[in-house]
């Protein structure tokens, strides 16, 4: 379940002016990347759905950020279908981005 409303996500993106995008298959490296980005002033972070274990890494990263840096808004990108979007939403994605407009994903 998302920790931030749609309006909070949008406002944070507008205020920051950028959304860093990344993927790493190693949970510990992903945590370090997220912490470094947060230390650099970014408040919104997009984790891309690119590897076999991406959902697992995302879930662990979301748990970590909820504890260590609860002001970071974590979302997911490279989502092309509704089942994958639902999986990430259930894992605390605050926003979902895809390379195309999929009405099924938008309904979620």
Model segments located where?
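Conserved N-terminal beta1-alpha1 strand-loop-helix module at the mouth
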Residues: 1-83, 87-91
């Amino acid at each position: 379940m998302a920790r931030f409303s749609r309006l909070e996500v949008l406002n944070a993106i507008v205020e920051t002016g950028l959304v860093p995008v990344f993927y790493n298959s190693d949970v510990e490296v992903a945590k370090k990347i997220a912490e470094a980005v947060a230390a650099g002033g970014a408040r919104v972070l997009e984790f891309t759905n690119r590897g076999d274990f991406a959902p697992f890494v995302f879930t662990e990263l979301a748990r970590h950020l909820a504890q260590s840096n609860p002001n970071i808004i974590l979302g997911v990108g490279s989502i092309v279908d509704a089942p994958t979007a639902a999986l990430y939403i259930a894992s605390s994605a605050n926003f979902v981005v895809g390379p195309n407009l999929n009405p099924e994903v938008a309904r979620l």
